[in-house]
Amino acid sequence: MQTGHPADGVYFGLMSGTSMDGVDGVAVRFEAGKPPAVLSEAFVGFADTLRDALFALQQPGDDEIEREALAANALAARYAVCCHELLRTAGLSPDDVRALGVHGQTVRHRPERGYTRQLNNAALLAELTRIDVIADFRSRDVAAGGQGAPLVPAFHATVFGSPDETRVVCNLGGISNITILPAGGGPQGEGHARNDTVRGHDCGPANALIDAWVERHLKQPFDDGGRFAARGTVDETLLAALLDEPYFRQNAPKSTGRDLFNADWLDAKLAGFQHLAPENVQATLTALTAATVADEIARHAGDCRAVYVCGGGARNPVLLDALATALAARGLDAAVATTAALGVPPQQVESLAFAWLAYRFNARAPGNVSTVTGAAGERVLGALYPR
């Protein structure tokens, strides 16, 4: 893109991840040749009734079409609340915003069967906000034979690369994923070529299982500060059983989700371990996340010198310490920090990425990295719902 590209302007990005606790939003200004400038951020939580409906839709059931449509409407309403909060805090009107990039809520991800489903009523969202909505980013990559995930590596390469060191950006959301940014890149300001050696894929479960277990036993939505895990001790026999999962042995490109790593998967793995105290299981689930991420980094980025964490797991110091320990145990001399050290608060990274993907859509520029997803080539991602 040239400086002063007509796609330049203010964009909103909304992301509700596999933790399903709510939607994160950012208002950001993109200009060709400059780093993104965040104007405001917001978080809007989901009511328990909506969370329950979304969890239920992840498993086959009766009357799914009706339940899916109603949940999509409810999501659009919450997304609109987040947008209105961004407008208020940034001092903007809808006419000031070029477009809103919204991920939607993943309820099924089956790229091997040729589809992925991110729930949202984008038409309703456009009506409620009077902002152009760009949605459905993953399906074009899947149509081109890709995994449809992860989609954030192109954004990571633009913002977090370094000319001097190999970096890994690790998202610890419901599912963990990594982006490997080889040395020689660098924060590039939109409009510059991406580093074609960027790689990335999903590693395995993160908060999806950690949150599910603490909610089951403490009736809390997440393990605040990792305190529940800190009370326990890792059970190495259980950890070995959890690691005995074919997905962990698959080669990249690969992606996963709650379709695989859910409460049923965990309960099946826990058969024979009923004697363990709940806090010991929690400690072991935390170790599982650290081990699977560290294994993938050791396998694909042995020269990594820094791991920058984003997502909800960035607020869990016990998990971050476990990751640092797991990396060292595999012979990696890599510091672990959050993306705040690079100037981007960890809770903003994914919503920023989807604002950036909306910007790419308006520029009719590719949003995927085909070497990451396995797609036949780079594609313009998303579909437009005009205001």
UniProtKB/Swiss-Prot annotation:
Sites where the protein binds ATP: 17-24
Q: Which domain of life is it from?
A: Bacteria
The record's section on NCBIfam families has: PRK09585.1-3 (NF007139), PRK09585.1-4 (NF007140)
Which reactions is this enzyme annotated as catalysing?
1,6-anhydro-N-acetyl-beta-muramate + ATP + H2O = N-acetyl-D-muramate 6-phosphate + ADP + H(+)
Q: Does the keyword NAD apply?
A: no
Q: Per its record, how is this protein called by name? A: Anhydro-N-acetylmuramic acid kinase
According to UniProt, this protein's pathway is: Amino-sugar metabolism; 1,6-anhydro-N-acetylmuramate degradation; Cell wall biogenesis; peptidoglycan recycling
Q: Which Pfam families match?
A: AnmK
Q: Where is the signal peptide?
A: none
Family per UniProt? Belongs to the anhydro-N-acetylmuramic acid kinase family.
Function as written in the Swiss-Prot or TrEMBL entry: Catalyzes the specific phosphorylation of 1,6-anhydro-N-acetylmuramic acid (anhMurNAc) with the simultaneous cleavage of the 1,6-anhydro ring, generating MurNAc-6-P. Is required for the utilization of anhMurNAc either imported from the medium or derived from its own cell wall murein, and thus plays a role in cell wall recycling.
Q: Does the keyword Acetylation apply?
A: no
Q: Could you tell me the EC number(s) of this protein?
A: 2.7.1.170
Sorted alphabetically, which keywords does the UniProt record give? ATP-binding, Carbohydrate metabolism, Kinase, Nucleotide-binding, Transferase
- State the Gene3D superfamilies in the record: 3.30.420.40
* Molecular function in Gene Ontology: ATP binding; kinase activity; phosphotransferase activity, alcohol group as acceptor
Which BP terms in the Gene Ontology apply to this protein?
A: 1,6-anhydro-N-acetyl-beta-muramic acid catabolic process; amino sugar metabolic process; peptidoglycan turnover
To which species is this protein native? Burkholderia pseudomallei (strain 1710b)
Quote the gene name from the UniProt entry.
anmK
